[in-house]
Amino acid sequence: MLNLRVVYLGTPQFAATVLETLVDARIHVVGVVTRADKPQKRSSKPIASPVKQLALSKNIPLLQPTKTTDPAFLAQLREWQADVFVVVAYGVILKQELLDIPKYGCYNLHAGLLPAYRGAAPIQRCIIAGETLSGNTVIRMDAGMDTGDIANVNHVAIGEDMTAGELAEALAGSGGELILKTLQEIEAGTVRHIPQDSAKATLAPKLTKEEGLVKWDAPASQVYAHIRGVSPAPGAWTRFLSQGKEPRRLGILSARMESSSGSHSPGEVLGVSGEDLLVACRQGVLRLCIVQPEGKVFMKAKDFFNGQSRSVALLF
């Protein structure tokens, strides 16, 4: 058990998984900071973040500031007398005044291999780009966006069918262990701080809903990587045109590669194979498995296709 006093800042499930690893390892988490509760999509009732729910269940003191620059909030942070802050997907760029509070500084777990994929969406962007390797990077934070010196790195292979959601789970699991290793090194005085090579930096900004739009005029492998990269959020979608009707939105929840090929127009629906719908790309064919027509529930792609009175064309 370490003697470090740790304050943890995080918000989504990814961060909750890492926090649980620290709690299970009996790290002395003296306080937790998370974002304010957000209203649910179909209700005005606010919902607590996964990190808040975990902190409450473990009876860990909790703060939810409206602004991280608020003097009263900063004073409360100082009262916790932390040795180190651990930041995991908190969701706000922190100012230097806050970063200077803990004795040994603030350490951030970034779900990507820095300096590549700096930003809010490293997991999604690396899958969309067709990468086969990802990992976590722990940095000692400065006021820049993911620009701090590197303390530790690990690697996670990206499976050929892995979605962003699945990669996030894998990275959260291994990320907790990487933070533990870093805390041990901080206490032992052996932690390293290696400057990033900014010449190799790339950006991974947050994805918009519009970026979920599938562009069929691309190789099937690229289309498949795009669908996996935006799953589960913001989600892949296309437009379908049923004869005599206006174009409508079709969510794509699940897809896979098809071995067959041929000469077809991108976006052309080739028919049903088993439970799936075959769609042509610029090179190759993709199987749509689970889809969601606009305003309807998830369904098998075959059932969607059979429910159309006449021919269907996917627009790209």
UniProtKB/Swiss-Prot annotation:
The lineage of its organism: Bacteria, Pseudomonadati, Chlamydiota, Chlamydiia, Chlamydiales. InterPro entries: Fmt (IPR005794), Formyl_trans_C (IPR005793), Formyl_transf_N (IPR002376), Formyl_transf_N_sf (IPR036477), Formyl_transferase-like_C_sf (IPR011034), GART_AS (IPR001555), Met-tRNA-FMT_C (IPR044135), Met-tRNA-FMT_N (IPR041711). It holds the Pfam family Formyl_trans_N. One of its GO terms (cellular component) is cytosol. It comes from Chlamydia muridarum (strain MoPn / Nigg). (6S)-5,6,7,8-tetrahydrofolate binds at G112, L113, L114, P115. It catalyses: L-methionyl-tRNA(fMet) + (6R)-10-formyltetrahydrofolate = N-formyl-L-methionyl-tRNA(fMet) + (6S)-5,6,7,8-tetrahydrofolate + H(+). It is an enzyme of class 2 (transferase). One of its GO terms (molecular function) is methionyl-tRNA formyltransferase activity. Attaches a formyl group to the free amino group of methionyl-tRNA(fMet). The formyl group appears to play a dual role in the initiator identity of N-formylmethionyl-tRNA by promoting its recognition by IF2 and preventing the misappropriation of this tRNA by the elongation apparatus. It comes from the Bacteria. The keyword Nucleus does not apply. Disulfide bonds: none annotated. Keywords: Protein biosynthesis, Transferase. Its EC number is 2.1.2.9. Belongs to the Fmt family. This is Methionyl-tRNA formyltransferase.
